[in-house]
UniProtKB/Swiss-Prot annotation:
The keyword NADP applies. Disruption phenotype: Mutant shows wild-type growth on glucose but a much slower growth rate on malate, fumarate, or succinate plus glutamate. Overexpression of the other three malic enzymes, mleA, maeA or malS cannot compensate for the ytsJ deletion. The ATP concentrations in the mutant grown in minimal medium with glucose are similar to the wild-type level. ATP concentrations decrease by about 20% in malate minimal medium. NADPH overproduction is virtually abolished in the deletion mutant. Belongs to the malic enzymes family. The keyword Secreted does not apply. This is Bifunctional malic/malolactic enzyme. PROSITE patterns: MALIC_ENZYMES. Its cofactor is Mg(2+); Mn(2+). It comes from the Bacteria. It comes from Bacillus subtilis (strain 168). The gene is ytsJ. SMART domains: malic (SM01274), Malic_M (SM00919). The active site is at Y36, K91. Its EC number is 1.1.1.40, 4.1.1.101. Divalent metal cations. Keywords: Lyase, Magnesium, Manganese, Metal-binding, NADP, Oxidoreductase.
Length: 410
């Protein structure tokens, strides 16, 4: 069978990828009296007296809503909520498989920002966290920022931050090979959508100061007269301080790092040759990268990462989001802040030892069982240190719990 035939068969024969499963058995009247009436009234009364006990007595503490409006699904674009549902189911499968997090798809039949925000807010009693997924820019930025302010559970747009965290982790290790520092490099990013914006924000937070971002109209700079929006205006305030104009070809000269989250073929061998010596290339357009790895290496690239599993250094969000939510849920975090994201970056990067580090191995493999426990531990610790954790736990216990819950490779 072809990939298409296999994929359709898997989804059809199982009627999707998720089901509801009870943690307790109801075999007799006693079981029924405990799981439902009259016994169920006891946790209800306790939660009514202390709302935080909802985490002790219900699924909330391990349940994430995977929310989409279907406007930016993979490489398929605006295909609507029903067509997005298989992706949301798949995301829930990854949450469970990689970190034991229960997740449920919520595909919303609206693109209205106010309606999406209000709907998610109304779901807060049920879910311990919210993963926003495949929502087009600029709505994705607005929705996330509003929900972070208007709810008290972690809200995380994975298309932005998951990609950013794994990319920066890869760059941390790639720079070890080059001997360069974050504060000294020039970075050119191509693609000003959700992932691109989040990557340069995290890089700036990490100490990178020489950043130029390009979109389809060329270099973004403060005061550019066309093709701007609120998010690009915000980015322009801390990037491209020399206000360079022109195309990607013009601004990439002497850059140390290229980060692409744009379209296939956007980066040419000639552009790579115009960069600084031994440039680092992260070409993450899917299904085909901005430049093929062999072409980038022929042009002088020292390290090349893509979004594909058939090339070395795959930038895969599954290295980030399961462990991030595991750590956040286990401390009952109210938010996922910058410190927690940076902790995730450091945890992922640290799993590649100095002995293992090479041009073809700067990012752990997606099925490396060490990743989710390490990320969960680091994120939980950072949450407690920055005051967004509701409870105190031993970070090592979080790691051990994650190891036991992870079912990949079994």
């Amino acid at each position: 069978m072809s990939l298409r035939e296999e994929a359709l068969h898997l989804h059809k024969v199982n009627q999707g990828k998720l089901e509801s499963k009870s943690k307790v058995e109801v075999r007799n009247a006693k079981d029924l009296s405990l799981a439902y009436s009259p016994g169920v009234a006891e946790p209800c009364k306790d939660i009514h007296e202390d709302i935080n006990k909802v985490y002790d007595y219900t699924m909330k503490g391990n349940m994430v809503a995977v929310v989409t409006d279907g406007t930016a699904v993979l490489g398929l674009g605006n295909i609507g909520p029903e067509a997005a549902l298989p992706v949301m189911e798949g995301k829930a499968v990854l949450f469970k498989s990689f970190a034991g997090v229960d997740a449920f798809p919520i595909a919303l039949n609206t693109n209205d920002v106010d309606k999406i925000v209000e709907t998610v807010k109304l779901l807060e009693p049920t879910f311990g966290g919210v993963n926003l997924e495949d929502i087009a820019a600029p709505n994705c930025f607005i929705i996330e920022e509003r929900l972070k302010k208007e709810t008290n559970i972690p809200v995380f747009h994975d298309d932005q931050h998951g990609t950013a965290i794994v990319t920066v982790a890869g760059l941390v290790n790639a720079l070890k090979l080059s001997g360069k520092s974050m504060s000294s490099i020039k970075v050119v990013a191509n693609g000003a959508g959700a992932a691109g914006i989040a990557i340069i924000k995290l890089l700036h937070h990490y100490g990178v100061r020489d950043i130029v971002m390009c979109d389809s109209k060329g270099a973004i700079y403060e005061g550019r007269p066309n093709g701007m929006n609120d998010v690009k205006n915000e980015v322009a305030k801390f990037t491209n301080q020399d206000r360079k104009d022109g195309s990607l070809k013009d601004v990439i000269v002497d850059a140390d790092v290229f980060i692409g989250v744009s379209v296939a073929g956007a980066l040419t061998k000639e552009m790579v040759q115009s960069m600084a010596k031994d440039p680092i290339i992260f070409a993450m357009a899917n299904p085909n990268p901005e430049i093929m790895p062999e072409d980038a290496r022929e042009a002088g690239a020292s390290v090349v990462g893509t979004g594909r599993s058939d090339f070395p250094n795959q930038v895969n969000n599954v290295l980030a989001f399961p462990g991030i939510f595991r750590g956040a849920l286990d401390v009952r975090a109210t938010h996922i802040n910058e410190e927690m994201k940076i902790a995730a970056v450091e945890a992922i990067a640290s799993l590649v030892s100095e002995d293992e580090l090479s041009a073809d191995y700067v990012i752990p493999a997606p099925f490396d069982k060490r990743v989710a426990p390490a990320v969960a531990k680091a994120v939980a610790k950072a949450a407690m240190e920055t005051g967004v954790a509701r409870i105190t736990v031993d970070p090592e216990e979080v790691a051990e719990k994650t190891r036991k819950l992870t079912i990949i490779g079994e």
